[in-house]
Amino acid sequence: FYGCKSLLSLPDISKWNTNNVPNMEYLFCNCESLLSLPDISKWNTNNITNIEYLFCNCESLSSLPDISKWNTKNITNMAGLFYGCKSLLSLPDISKWNTNNVINMSGLFNNCESLKSLPDISKWITNNVKYMEYLFNACTSLSSLSDISKWNTNNVKTIKYLFNDCKSL
């Protein structure tokens, strides 16, 4: 669906067999007019390693399906996952996502300018993360953040603009 700028809705793709899908990057990216997504909460994500820019620039979405129970243990790249989701008012509770293998988190919440808070991501394991730049960049309405002081950043190579333009923090 990449780049379907005028698409307002999607057919029911909730029963798609995603058992063998390793890569979902850019799947809904640049669907700027998309108002809602079908329930994709039950997709089998066991084999997925890349969700980079999955919802990128879905500018009209104000909410997402409950993806809190997605199995994220094999994901190495979640860069820009919610990048440019300017109308998102909240996120599903992704606090229990397994981030043990994630290497790239850059721009994960970048430009989510309507989000006032995030789920508690303080317990995310960041031991393997190398890229965190722009993680919360331009989250202009973000007024609270869980305590991420215990995140292990020993392997991080780039962390620039982490909280750039977070005017409400």
Regions found by a protein language model. Name each.
Residues 1-169:
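Negatively charged
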